[in-house]
Amino acid sequence: MPFRLLLSAPAAVVEIDTGKLIRPPADSATLSGTLELDPKNPRVGLLVRWKNAAAPGEHRFAKLTLEAPGQATFTHVFDASGDIEDFLELPFPAAP
């Protein structure tokens, strides 16, 4: 499934876990590629370690956009005051 991940700040590490762990190069504010989802458990885990710590009171985000075949475009924003380590159960089935 095609994806885009927009980061609010430069990252040192990005990991996307759908049951298969991928580590896209974190050298851009926008990452894209293809995710393989587990059709029995469509979920996305995200880990973002920022290059620089956030300023006090500053929130960082990662906006994930998925283009599921036959579905409306799906967008979710992960947000945290520091590094992001979260997961999302997707509201639609993965294509078999």
Residue ranges of model-derived segments:
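Short beta-strand segments within Ig-like beta-sandwich modules, predominantly Fibronectin type-III
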Residues: I22-A29
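Beta-strand-rich recognition domains
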Residues: M1-I16, T30, E36-P96
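Glycine-centered positions in the ABC transporter ATPase nucleotide-binding domain
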Residues: T18-K20
